[in-house]
Amino acid sequence: MWSRQRMRHKPLWALISLTVLLLVLDKSNANTEPVETSTTSEPDASPGCRAPDVRFTIVKPEATTEQPLAKFETTQIYLPEDFTTADVEFVDSVPRHPNENHAAVINPYSLDLGDDHLHVGDAAASLVGDDDLGDEDEDHHGDPEDKRLNANRKQGKRRRAGSGRRRRIENENGQTGRGRGSRYKRHAILHDTEASPETDRWAGSKLAAEGDVYYVHIADILKSREPNRELKSKLHKLKMKARLNKCLAEGGKEKCTRLLKKKPKKKVVEKEQTLKKEKKFPKEEQSKEKVPENGQTPKEDELELDHPETAAAHHRRRGDSHAAELDQRDRSPRWRRRRSTEFKGDLGQLPPESGIGPEPEPLADQDLKDLQQYGNQSSSARVALLWQRVKRKSGKTTGALSRPKGGGDSSSKTTSRKDKGIYDEEAGYTPIHPDDPEFDEEEEEDEEVDILQQFTEVSEIRFPGEIGPMGDRRLCKIRCVKGKWVGPLCATNEEDDNGNVKFQPLYKSCHVNRIPSHLLLSYRNISVTPIPPNRGWRKTRLSKSTLLSNTEINVGWDLPHGHSLQARCQELGIYKLLGESRVLCSNGLWAPRMPSCVPTTVLTNYSEDSAPSIRIKIFNGSHSFEPSGVMAVPPHSTVLMDCMYPRVRGTPEWSWTSWYMQYSTGWSPAQEEKAVRYRLSIKNIENNDSGTFTCTSPRGLTNSIAVVVATSTCPQLTEPLAPLKLRLEGNKLGQRAHYECPEGFRLDGAWNATCLASGNWSSPTPTCHAIQCPRLELDDPHLSLIELNTSAWGRAVFKCQWGFKLTGPAQLDCEPSGVWSGPVPRCKVIQCVMPVAPLNGRIGGTSLSQRRLTVGALVTFSCNDGHSLVGESSIICTENGQWSHSPPFCKSQCPYPGDPPNGLIAPLKFNYDAGDYLSVQCRPGFVQSYEGPPERPKCQPDGRWSGPMPKCKSYEEV
């Protein structure tokens, strides 16, 4: 199998090999990097797109584009001009709040069963997709994100793996002619096994509003002989309930009255009458069965029972896989009684308590309960009900959107969701049941509804797609952007930081890393050459909208797929273009390669290996160099083209494409020019002179100038808005408009524009923007700005945190050139000098352990015994880097010795300085007594007294 597939895609493998070779060559080219694709933020999705048509779409590539081989069951999509690439979040769950809706998965209803071996219950379950099996009425919050992703991958794997088995089963059952679409499950109706025909709820969609899902009891519908018609009748009544419920909720009596008086369409009435006739009481059917005995003509239903083969063929044409079971049921009268359920109540009237119009017939109890139930639902649920008003006139089901029918073989047939038929790439659509007289698109017409009103909340739809020659299946989607569907965007193998799948467009854009030197690129006759750095160059990313609004864009942009650029050299004749003048972006590659410009003789010192240069002079008129590299001149001008080649090496040769024209050639007559200028002269040039003029050197190297004679008048330019200034030469061919901005402003765009032969200016009017100095990068965490003005002549004022000081200018000025007057300053920590410990003293403090005495550091001083501190005992480091006080010193002192008994010491002090004397005064009756010579105690420098204190003794002791 693998070998057959490889042989089948052998040309494709060759094309892939060639593409890889081109990629390697392009990477070796230092000028461009076309393979890289940049991922930019996708335009924000905005609800409000019209309901897309469900159809089978085969992406048709351009002639020069490698075929992506992608097929989608999706909508007809449109790509806005300003859309390039996308990197959007993977959306799996359905939001539950109207303000949070960003995605929707909307499923059609259908009863085309694909497995005839299933019984009724299994057949009903086959209508439920893997995503729908877990949906219960009370659980609308979805599974965790990882479970949803795993379920999505497993579901795609099952669809791929089971395709061959299903094909074999159908071949054995004779179902090969039914096409591919019926093999796959239709995700439409959810079967509630505990429900009954009286508790039916509408199914068929998960809307973006709140994701409400409604269930229908399918068992009786599947037992019906005409399940599609039975389902339509049931759904019609449910829709009528929703309409009445909405009418009652809004309280518009007049609107409800009009709803009552509104007559249903003729075909709808005929269907209802047909259903009522089929659903008669069994006794009436028994009485009808006796009609032939009375000689009357049997009814149509009895004729169908008499011809079960016809009914079976009818179901086979419709693709119903349970035709055999229906065969047996059609033969049994008991089957007709089983499907004779009558829906109670008339939904075309209001309850009596509404008080509107005449007295209507009361609703049945169950209908009243249902009506009350729907009345308690949110507005989004009522929108979900209204959404089901499908427009069937054109065979479309506008509510049927983007659910996979899938498949592995990209060339097989597929059944459209519109029941339009079986699609074949060669034969187109083939009707599913062309011989069915009961199938009529006009009979399926229902009430037309403005789908835009029900689709305003849907902004994104996802679907599976087959990518590549091997049918690789990926999750793809379309988004509503600016009122148009954008896409398809298909999932990549990468994930973002949150674990969500990344999406990218099917076609890759071309990335340009840098434009080759001296090469001018134009898009739609508008220059996209980068602005030189001295003119306020800044890096910009390019989209299609940017291309239209900016004339000169720096390198590093993307060109969307399918769009082309025009290329020419800056100075025609001085540089020679190597390559094509037009390059097309084709699925990430340039077709052909990006050209380059090579210098000629005047730039290479007349090297023999260089092509000759061509100098151009125009008299009696102006000229313009077109984006395609053509020189346009007005009629009746004189054109002189000089081939620059040394005369001593030989004589070059001029040739031209207009072979029937004759021009004079020869060396220039001027004395200073005749040594290197071989001239071709065209006097009074006319339209017949248009063509390509080539100069060939004696060594065979050539250089050409394409000339076209044209007359054009460009639109008159109005005076631009201040501060932009315009100096206009005129608006004829080749005349220029020069723009200028005053000092302090930067010109954004081209400095001049030339009137081209097309009648358009080469560049749009530029704009003046106030020069802004670049953003200041504050790397120092202690540095802050207290004033900032980045405009010209503005200033930036800096400040450091407390405890730090500036090293550098405290203020920078923004100069008119757009640069700052100096570098950004820095902050340096403030420190004080370590103080010296005093003599006979000590120094202390917690700041000493930090080894840095910064602002706020505290230092304390103390003295040894016998010494007293002179000065402040503690000092602090201030913001100017100085101590708050001078360091203290220690002075020697004698302590207070205490009063002797019966006496007093004089003078009385706490401490005594060195050299102080003490005297003792005794109390009356006592006299001083000395143990030695009578000397007074003296305080010595070491802090000790010279002798003991005198004692006071009584007269008796003396």
Curated annotation (Swiss-Prot):
Tissues/organs with expression: Expressed in PCC neurons and neuroblasts in the procephalic neurogenic region in the central nervous system. Expressed in nerves running along the surface of the ventral ganglion and that extend to the peripheral tissues. Also expressed in motor nerves and boutons of certain muscles, in particular of muscle 8 in the A2 and posterior abdominal segments of young adult flies. In the brain, expressed in both the neuropiles and cortical regions except the retinular cells and laminar neuropile.
Gene3D superfamilies: Complement Module, domain 1, Immunoglobulins
Motif (Cell attachment site): 318-320
GO CC annotation terms, alphabetical: neuronal cell body; synaptic cleft
Residue stretches of biased makeup (Basic and acidic residues): 139-149, 267-292, 320-333
Biased composition (Acidic residues): 129-138, 437-447
One example of a Gene Ontology biological process annotation: synaptic target recognition
Keyword Hydrolase: no
PANTHER family recorded: COMPLEMENT COMPONENT-RELATED SUSHI DOMAIN-CONTAINING, LOCOMOTION-RELATED PROTEIN HIKARU GENKI
Listed name of the protein: Locomotion-related protein Hikaru genki
Organism: Drosophila melanogaster (Fruit fly)
Gene name as annotated: hig
